[in-house]
Structures are given as structure tokens and as C-alpha cells.
């Protein structure tokens, strides 16, 4: 978060009946935890007199020798980025997006904005590319084709093949900007079965809630209901409620608007355990 480099805060977490946690320093906030996989929280920052909210997402620290082969594959992702100085000064709005991110076993990467790498690896829309550098402890530096440092990637991966990608984008205006990107492997969205359940979420707008799914049907905590279309606009994505979602076997829930007019936020959540 802007201006918070190296800052630390401490407190305690109280577990709620719905499986979420409340931090002692923010009684109206929720912390979402997938044990040994992922932690999702949110924080409010006052910048130039304007309240701004950001998500805080982390994966377990590992001392294992994580290699490119461990994280290789194609990921579906959602992201939120500040592309201008005005955005970082709270006089402009961030931009959310969705797309695909491919990593090879040699550490090269290709990103396709609002398009599917698998369908067109060499000329997908919004194509960008570069390389990853090993930093150790499950972290990787992301560099552009011109060797510009774009940020840091962290990965959860398990022996069973589950993966979660978390990318912290640094201050690099004119390309990816400052922000965040989250992804899960591109696999078929088999609605129902293990994907059924309740997912708690936090947003970059400063609110939280939950959505329950059963097959192709969903119900938000506020009472809104609807249906989902699996593998739309491509494999692993889900068309629902005016946006695109991902509900992964890893227990992760992600959502962002598919309308460019409303692409100023994203939602990250986890399945109730």
C-alpha cells in the first residue's frame, strides 16, 4: 500500500461463526483465511483527505526451493491497477481487468488482457511478455521484455497441483501501474459438487459480504439471486451478475465487472471451511 512500506501492526483475530475472523483493531472488518493457502484482508487509507480501500492478500512463506516448473501453466486472473499519477493521488479512479497469464517452465511469461492466451498464444489481445527472476522463498521478480521491474509475484502451490498466484505491481506508470493481480489455474468451471458452498469476500470498495452457490444458481447475502454460465467467456471463467467470476478448487473466489464503464473495483474471497 502507498506509504506503508515496512510498517507493522499487531493484534489478535477472533473467529466468527461463519468461519471469518475479526481483527482486534478493526471490529467492522473481516479477515478471510484458507488454512495454509491464503489470507485476505482489507485496509482503509486516507490519501489527500479521501478514503481509499485496498485489499491485503498473502500466501504462506515457504523455504522450499520453488522452481518455474512448480508454477508453470496458464492462469485466469483479475486485477486492479492505478495507471496514472492522478489515481495514486486519489483524484482518479483505478482500472480493473481480467485476462490470462501464462508461465513457462523456463520462467518466461505472457499476459493477455481481457483475452485468452490458450486460444491465441502469439497474438492474443492486449498481449505483453517478459521474464520471471527467482527471489527465493516462493517469490519471483516480474520483469518486462525491456527488463523493467514490474513487481513481485508470490505463489501457493501444493503437491496435488493446486496453485494461487498473487502479484504486487509496483509504481510503473504507462504499463501495468501500481496495483494487484490474482489468478488461479485455467481449468474447467464444473459448477456444482465441490464448488457448491458459501464464499465470503472483501472488495476494493471497502465492503464485504458472501455469496452461496448451488449448481448454476447463486444467492448473495443481500438477497440478490441469479444464474451462472460456466466457461464463459473462456475455460474456467464464469459469467454472473454483470461480471466474470472464478470459483476454483483451491477455495478461491474472484470477481470483477465485465463492463468497462464499471471497471473500478474487484472482489476477492474464500470458501467457508
Question: Where is each model-derived feature located?
Answer:
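Mature soluble binding/inhibitory domains
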Residues: 1-273
Amino acid at each position: 500500500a502507498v506509504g506503508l512500506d515496512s510498517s507493522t501492526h499487531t493484534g489478535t483475530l477472533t473467529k466468527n461463526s461463519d468461519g471469518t475472523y475479526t481483527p482486534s483493531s478493526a471490529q467492522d472488518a473481516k479477515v478471510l483465511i484458507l488454512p495454509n493457502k491464503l489470507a485476505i484482508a482489507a485496509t482503509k487509507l486516507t490519501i489527500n483527505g479521501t478514503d481509499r480501500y485496498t485489499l491485503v492478500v498473502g500466501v504462506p512463506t515457504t523455504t522450499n526451493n520453488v522452481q518455474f516448473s512448480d508454477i508453470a501453466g496458464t492462469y485466469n486472473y483479475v486485477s486492479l491497477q492505478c495507471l496514472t499519477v492522478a489515481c495514486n493521488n486519489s483524484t482518479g479512479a483505478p482500472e480493473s481487468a481480467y485476462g490470462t497469464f501464462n508461465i513457462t517452465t523456463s520462467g518466461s511469461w505472457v499476459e493477455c488482457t481481457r483475452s485468452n492466451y490458450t486460444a491465441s498464444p502469439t497474438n492474443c489481445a492486449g498481449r505483453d511478455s517478459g521474464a520471471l527472476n527467482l527471489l527465493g522463498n516462493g517469490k519471483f521478480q516480474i520483469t518486462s521484455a525491456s527488463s523493467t521491474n514490474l513487481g513481485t509475484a508470490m505463489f501457493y502451490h501444493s503437491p496435488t497441483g493446486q496453485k494461487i498466484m498473487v502479484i504486487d505491481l509496483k509504481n510503473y506508470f504507462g504499463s501495468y501501474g501500481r496495483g494487484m493481480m490474482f489468478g488461479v489455474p485455467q481449468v474447467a468451471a464444473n459448477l456444482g459438487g465441490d464448488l457448491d458452498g458459501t464464499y465470503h469476500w472483501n472488495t476494493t470498495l471497502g465492503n464485504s459480504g458472501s455469496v452461496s452457490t448451488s449448481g448454476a444458481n447463486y444467492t448473495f447475502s443481500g438477497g440478490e439471486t441469479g444464474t451462472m454460465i460456466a466457461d464463459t467467456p473462456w475455460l474456467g471463467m464464469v459469467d454472473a451478475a454483470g461480471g466474470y467470476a472464478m470459483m476454483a478448487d483451491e477455495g478461491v473466489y474472484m470477481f470483477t465487472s465485465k463492463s468497462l464503464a464499471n471497471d473500478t473495483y474487484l472482489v476477492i474471497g474464500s470458501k467457508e471451511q
